[in-house]
């Protein structure tokens, strides 16, 4: 009886954990968005997200405008990681 209870509790806990992981993944990346990375000259500045959005628009036009970005400085360049419409 003890082992059956332990098995049941383990299955319930595993179910909650797996369900939570799927919810977190859904929040992290919208389904209609694709990730893009690119390196640009200069630094991120005080608002790196806005810098990256402007860099992508300059490179690819308004159609390439990302919805959100992260910016990392690398010497005289910066790396932009953004989500754009697929």
Curated annotation (Swiss-Prot):
Q: What are the entry keywords? A: Antimicrobial, Disulfide bond, Fungicide, Plant defense, Secreted, Signal
Family of this protein: Belongs to the DEFL family.
Q: According to its UniProt record, where is this protein mainly located? A: secreted
One Gene Ontology CC term in the entry: extracellular region
List the signal peptide residues: 1-26
Q: Give the superkingdom in one word.
A: Eukaryota
Q: Where in the cell is it found?
A: Secreted
Query: What's a single GO BP term from this record?
Result: killing of cells of another organism
User: Per UniProt, what is one Pfam family of this protein?
Assistant: SCRL
Q: Which cysteines are cross-linked by disulfides?
A: 34-86, 44-71, 52-80, 69-82
The protein, known as: Putative defensin-like protein 234
Which organism does this sequence originate in?
Arabidopsis thaliana
């Amino acid at each position: 009886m003890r082992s059956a209870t332990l098995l049941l509790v383990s299955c319930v806990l595993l179910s909650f954990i797996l369900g939570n992981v799927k919810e977190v993944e859904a929040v992290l990346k919208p389904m209609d968005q694709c990730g893009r990375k690119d390196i640009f000259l200069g630094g991120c500045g005080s608002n790196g997200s806005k810098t990256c959005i402007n860099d992508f628009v300059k490179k690819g036009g308004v159609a390439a405008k990302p919805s959100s970005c992260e910016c990392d400085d690398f010497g005289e360049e910066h790396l932009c990681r953004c989500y754009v419409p697929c």
